[in-house]
Amino acid sequence: MGVSVVIPTYNRAALVSRAVDSALRAISPGDEIIVVDDASTDDTERALAAYGDRIRYQRVPHRGAGAARNFGISVARNPLVAFLDSDDEWMPHILTLERALLQARPDVLFCCSNFAVRAKGMEKRRYLSNWFSRPCTWDELFGPGVGYSSLAPLPKDVPDFSVHIGDFYLSLVKEGCVCTITVLVRRESAAEALRFAEDLPTYEDWECFARVARVGLGAYLDCETAWNYGHSGPRLTDAEDYDRATTRLTIYSRVWGHDRDFLSKHSALFEEAVRTQRLIRARAMLRDGRRAEARDELRLVKDAPLAYRAASLVPGWLFSGNAIRSVLKAKDRILERASGVRTRIGAGG
């Protein structure tokens, strides 16, 4: 089965060659690399010209990483599609492992894996669990694992590892557990579900793969297949916390909130996920002095913490000594509950 590799890029002239080179090392005859240039204003086109017909260069109007990926999917010629961001890098064995798994298990719609991070001169291995809001096992998230070698041949230089096949649609409510640059998916079987949101400021990949997971089974390969070059910076501001929680609520509503069958079985899980994001929004409002708005938000939260309710009612209470620290600690406790989606390090495209 051939693979179409989609690489969106925007003003990454100094970095895109690293991504393309890693994709060239990973592909096989019949595969293709589609680089979608989201109207870069730097020397990206010149940097890619050297590859000639080894890649398909496509320049599109500037509409963001989600739209660029969607364009790449629309012009893909092969039955399998993989994604790589232009500032990241694949490990050489990614397509060998994932393609063989999908060939061995035609009932699996897509697969993904762990990854490693390079940031500020440091390396962090097996990074995916850092996205989780609480400690949990791969068995808990994806179902019992089996050895990869029991499903497909292992490359000589790769030690055996576990593969977990299961319902990612349920798992993605609990945790952000799919890293886009490690995904290989059956294009035609995923159909319209394989589409990235173009109206969201972030988490468009989370929504996309939640929709894909609703269509069919996913497989998690417990090995590293990619390097993410992290853009670590200062702690998120309250405004950013608010915006991200708002986006998460939008996705919860659009994906799971309209799925009656899912809600009939997992309403408590869904409600807890929504509750967590509403508390994050309320906390940001309180820190910003928007007490009336925070009260409105807290009315939508079952059993809202006393510290939040007090801060929304008493003028100035939030900004007095230990009170603000108690609210900050409350946020940490909230995020430990099983529902949030951990912010991904690194930017798409």
Language-model features: locations:
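Conserved nucleotide-sugar donor-binding catalytic segment
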Residues: 113, 138-242
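Short, acidic, metal-binding catalytic loop of nucleotide-sugar glycosyltransferases
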Residues: 21-30
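Catalytic core of nucleotide-sugar-dependent glycosyltransferases
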Residues: 224-232, 237-265, 286-303
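Conserved donor NDP-sugar-binding/catalytic core segment of glycosyltransferases
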Residues: 93-147
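A conserved acidic beta->alpha catalytic loop
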Residues: 22, 37-46, 62, 85
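Acidic helix N-cap motif at the loop->helix transition within catalytic regions
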Residues: 17, 42-50, 89, 93
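Glycine-rich, basic loop-to-helix element that forms the pyrophosphate-binding segment
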Residues: 60-76
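Short aromatic/hydrophobic "clamp" motif used to bind/position activated sugar donors
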Residues: 81
